[in-house]
């Protein structure tokens, strides 16, 4: 049988399964691909194919992740599933697998467990915007009241971490039954209900090109007779010749005007997300712009120095530190294209951080960086990556 080709005309959404070990994340992932492939085309993936997740490196960190794809009536989904808890932590913090929404798998037989809580908290910290719940193994619970109790517990837990617990879609089912071809309410029907919930509850993500213009500065040149050219890859939005833009970060913010956009030695009237361009700036001196700043739509992003972050510290095996660090540790924080020194403030109950740990910390940078919540960074010592993090909350 020929493999059904995915039509790229459908909007694309990134999702993933999260939840406690052995609650059925991988079985559910296999069940979704199996049920939806028969209905909408695509490829069914077995449990073993997904469980044998290949190792990949994101920012020098080893992560095991399985990637599957499936489609529904209206969308194309890319879905990530990780075999181990540590892989989830790394994946979510590095943003290796960006999620527009997550499917939280909770065993109806066990209810919420420590990693259930931790994954919800991580989702909040790293900015996963939507969570849908699949109450798995519902075939193993005969008591309807017990099922209701577990549902209430999950809703309360979501609300505790600022997700709308009362409005969160909760689908009850059995991934195992669905995978075995059971056509009943807890089998195939539950998977179809879950797919419908994904389609309706997670909004179509904004495309990069629709965002506010932002380009990290990679290099700066002076071209005699023409002025200063800044090169980089446009991260989001569009810039048109003649538009005002701001140079943000490191130094006080200044306004300038884009007088030219160049790509592959051709002049364009605009550049957009994904383009590697040179942008000509009017009246800006070469020494006014440096690597590590960003060009942005005026007022769209501000420079900040103080923030809280969710951080993963590389293990010794990953090439990280061999020893713990303590409060007041001062490494470099690598944002987009440059390193800035910063001081780390640990939570009161945390005396030290060991290689391989993940931790919430407060950081104070020596120079301001154009920053938004959800921005990823690396922690470095002398050019060597020792950690990865994401801005959870801006303080100043």
Curated annotation (Swiss-Prot):
Keywords: Cytoplasm, Elongation factor, GTP-binding, Hydrolase, Magnesium, Metal-binding, Nucleotide-binding, Protein biosynthesis
Localization: Cytoplasm
Principal location listed in the UniProt entry: cytoplasm
Sequence positions that bind Mg(2+): 26
Chain spans, region G1: 19-26
GO CC list: cytosol
Molecular-function annotations in GO: GTP binding; GTPase activity; guanosine tetraphosphate binding; translation elongation factor activity
Pfam families in UniProt: GTP_EFTU, GTP_EFTU_D2, GTP_EFTU_D3
Annotated EC: 3.6.5.3
Reactions performed catalytically: GTP + H2O = GDP + phosphate + H(+)
Domain tr-type G: 10-206
PANTHER family recorded: ELONGATION FACTOR TU, MITOCHONDRIAL, ELONGATION FACTOR TU-RELATED
Subunit annotation: Monomer.
The family this protein is said to belong to: Belongs to the TRAFAC class translation factor GTPase superfamily. Classic translation factor GTPase family. EF-Tu/EF-1A subfamily.
Protein name: Elongation factor Tu
Gene source species: Bordetella avium (strain 197N)
Protein encoded by which gene: tuf1
